[in-house]
Amino acid sequence: MYTTKSLLSTLIPIMIPLSLGSVSSPNLLPTPPMGFNNWARFMCDLNETLFLETASAMISTGLLEAGYNRLNLDDCWMAYDRAADSSLQWNTTKFPHGIPWLAYRLKTQGFHLGIYQDAGNLTCGGYPGSFGYEALDAQTFAAWGIDYLKLDGCNVFPEHSRTLEEEYKARYAHWHNVLRQMHPPLIFSESAPAYFADPANLTSWYEVMDWVPAFGELARHSTDILVYVGEGSAWDSIMVNYHYNTLLARYQRPGYFNDPDFLIPDHPGLTLEEKRSQFALWASFSAPLIVSAYIPGLSGEELAILRNEELITVDQDVLGLQATLASRGEEVDVLTRSLAHGDQLLTVLNRGDGVPVVRVPVEWMGLQRGCAYVVKNLWDGEVQVLEEEIVIRLNSHATQVYRIALPEECSTVIPTGIVFNTASGNCLTDENGERVGFEACRGSETQVWQVSELGHLHPLSRTSHCLTAGSQASVQLCTGQKNQQWTYEITGNLKNEHTKMCLTEGTGISQCGFERDSQVFGLPSGVDIKSS
């Protein structure tokens, strides 16, 4: 979007679904949640003592004051059987004083207690699921003092000749309807998309992602982050979930947030630089900051990461935009987004093992040359004045984040970044002449595009030209004709206003299909989105 200081103006008319979140309003969860969950660190080894010790440590270390005010129980908190009246029961060995007592105790300390259930007949751990008991379970949780529900999706099987996706939609829609009738409703975290995140074919995943923002406030969209005792690379696990999150920016808005899973700052497989990177990336995404770690044992360096006030402010920014890819090379990602009050965010990630020197021109940030931009490093607080480019030296797996203040005379931001196919990862590329195609992303300005307020896409390599629809997609001198105007839809389609056909990797342009992998694209942050 174009931003002039704090004023956000419309590019392409935006159509918002009538129902935003569980209560048709973003006010239930206007910014992403912050807190603690036991799963990635302790899995089923949760109990009353753990949560009391965690709360005490969060108070003494300043995490509560920093905003981490939610403590969420995950799977295995229940008894294996429901009570005689069919209500859920807690495990009395793990929680001798009971869940209501724990919720009240935590509330007096300034925390909110959240809980876990499953849309199937059993939870992932084999405990009683919610299927057939949704209203009763919701009432039970509310009576216990719970205000946040994470609903998993294990053991869901199609009923009434529905497809699996239709079954998930029916069950999560039912939960949405149950919750919206409560006063107040519970915050609703949906895990349904995680059961459809198949990189071989993303169509079903996107079909689920199309409806989850209308039902809840956040969604666990893909694979679980590596648990503390898990095998494999914790950094690779973070990068997998980071990658999935980059595909979903179009869905996020205030009141609904994409959830790439827990922060794992005490994982033994991570370097300090990697721990910093996960936090910086999640904050740049305005993702939930839910820590799964042994809080009393966190080091001073780990706590300093989690308490970084500047990055928390970015995460909690009221615009709720997700940082998107301005550029992608073999090892380096450059992400940008607009912030409230007219500032711009720049995040630069080194995915590789080398130590590159990265040059980021102001145009990649959606800005213009010849202005004096005040740039603040959000890790060390260093301030510099930027006019043409910023030069960054990045350690292996490091992430630098900068907040950029725009002077009044240079306060216009043009949405700028790569246009990439979310299935292949390839970038729309200006091939000179009239040709346009898709190639591996290589950090070139021929793959960086500006999106104008009229829906014109200009390659940064020649901004007088526009992406043009004809018998093929091409790059032509801009004329203002409708065959150069494009609309970005919530489905990820980039539809031409003249031909009503969609940009397509492989053929250039073709009839629009339903969530076809070849027609789903990521665009820069700030481009308004047309809802179907």
Swiss-Prot record:
Q: Which Gene Ontology molecular-function terms are recorded?
A: alpha-galactosidase activity; carbohydrate binding
Entry's EC annotation: 3.2.1.22
In its UniProt entry, what is this protein called? Probable alpha-galactosidase A
> Gene encoding it?
aglA
Q: Which residues form the Ricin B-type lectin domain?
A: 410-531
Q: What does this protein do?
A: Hydrolyzes a variety of simple alpha-D-galactoside as well as more complex molecules such as oligosaccharides and polysaccharides.
Subcellular localization: Secreted
Q: Which organism is it from?
A: Neosartorya fischeri (strain ATCC 1020 / DSM 3700 / CBS 544.65 / FGSC A1164 / JCM 1740 / NRRL 181 / WB 181)
Q: Which residues form a coiled coil?
A: none
Cleavable signal peptide: 1-21
Gene3D superfamilies linked to this entry: 2.80.10.50, Aldolase class I (3.20.20.70), Golgi alpha-mannosidase II (2.60.40.1180)
Q: Which CDD domains match?
A: beta-trefoil_Ricin_AglA, GH27
